[in-house]
Regions:
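Conserved donor-binding loop and adjoining core beta-sheet/short helix segment
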Residues: 15-114, 241-264, 310
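Acyl-donor-binding surface of acyltransferase catalytic domains
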Residues: 66-181
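Aromatic (often tryptophan-rich) hydrophobic motifs at membrane interfaces
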Residues: 219-324
């Protein structure tokens, strides 16, 4: 990820963003600033309330009382101003990967934003202790506090896996058996843009949650055709796209900002086949695959290593210190949570 990202109105890319985005420093680091009133389905990428309360309430919808209690807590936190949050280094995708130069600029940009947005909470998403130790020390010096966010899974293929798990072997064999066409596109036609957008909506929005980023056609057009990302597409014998994954590369790391597959197409193991193609691409590139969160059991059975990811938050300036105490309390309350705790709960 670098300065090649175009300057756009965020809503033109993410219709439920409820935020504006600016670019700071010599490394063009993105900073998203929430706007209020927020969209009722504000994406979790830009809204702490959506990430920690609304999304959880959605997942607990089969338990109405639990969902209502979680939503009530979210309302209380919103009264304390959490909807007004500026996120530093926050690309409009689920997992932001920074260069070393960008990480060096984060503390100074944080100080700048604290001055320019004194009534906002300041946050940094996607912090991993095993990858961001120096940055964590710098943020602690600025009194940022760590709040557990989610469990992400890494596949370190920079020197290859020593052993291929049995589930992964079966996925790779299935991909080979089906004799599908696989293309890693650096440009998309209008027809392809419409198709991948449709597949994304089927999985992320219709199957899972409207709190996921509601990407527009313009997003898929610009991130691929302006070569910010590539698009791995799997086609059938009729040359119809049956699944896809956006590939975002930063140094040695690959992330998957969006994917989708046709849930109505009669393809054996659609998600397994797509993962096998993603894995093969990452292995051939000798990359570190950050495969984000979700489907934890699936990823662990294929060699994914779980890590607890954090969001670091700094309270805004205020007269009575209530927001500072809230953040300190939340950090202390959650400090004993580890990755296995969340895995037991389905992460």
């Amino acid at each position: 990820m670098n300065a090649a990202w175009p300057i756009v109105n965020l809503i033109d890319w993410v219709s439920n963003a409820s935020a504006k985005i600016g670019w700071y420093g010599t490394t063009s680091l993105p900073v998203s600033v929430a706007v209020v009133p927020r969209h009722k389905e504000a994406s979790y990428i830009f809204s702490p309330r959506s990430a920690w309360f609304d999304y959880l309430a959605h997942e607990c919808r089969s338990k109405p009382l639990s969902a209502l209690a979680i939503q009530f807590l979210g309302k209380i936190v919103s009264f304390l101003g959490i909807d007004k949050t500026a996120f530093i280094g926050n690309y409009p995708i689920s997992t932001s990967i920074w260069t070393e130069s960008q990480m060096e600029e984060i503390p100074s940009i944080a100080t700048t934003i604290m001055t320019s947005q004194p009534k906002h909470f300041i946050g940094i998403r996607n912090i991993l202790p095993h990858r961001h130790a120096k940055l964590i020390k710098q943020l602690a010096h600025l009194d940022f506090k760590a709040i557990p966010s989610r469990v992400i899974y890494e596949f370190d293929l920079r020197s290859g896996l020593t052993q291929t798990p049995s589930h992964l072997k079966r996925d790779l064999s299935l991909l080979k058996k089906l004799n599908l066409t696989i293309k890693n596109a650096t440009a998309l036609t209008q027809q392809e843009i419409i198709r991948v957008h449709q597949l994304y909506q089927q999985i992320y929005l219709e199957k899972h949650s409207l709190l996921n980023p509601q990407y527009t056609l313009q997003f898929f057009d610009q991130v691929v055709n302006q070569r910010i990302m590539t698009c791995l597409m799997i086609g059938n014998s009729s040359n119809s796209i049956v699944s896809f994954a956006l590939i975002c590369t930063s140094g040695e790391t690959i992330s998957i900002p969006a994917l989708g597959y046709d849930s109505e197409y009669e393809l054996e193991g659609s998600y397994r086949v797509l993962f096998a193609a993603i894995y093969t691409h990452a292995k051939n590139a000798q990359a570190l695959l950050n495969y984000s969160s979700g489907a934890g059991d699936f990823k662990r059975k294929r060699g994914g290593i779980p890590y607890l990811e954090y969001t670091y938050l700094k309270y805004p300036k205020e007269k009575y210190g209530l927001k500072r105490r809230l953040i300190h309390f939340a950090a202390k309350l959650t400090s004993q949570i580890d990755v296995q705790d969340l895995i037991k709960r389905g992460a």
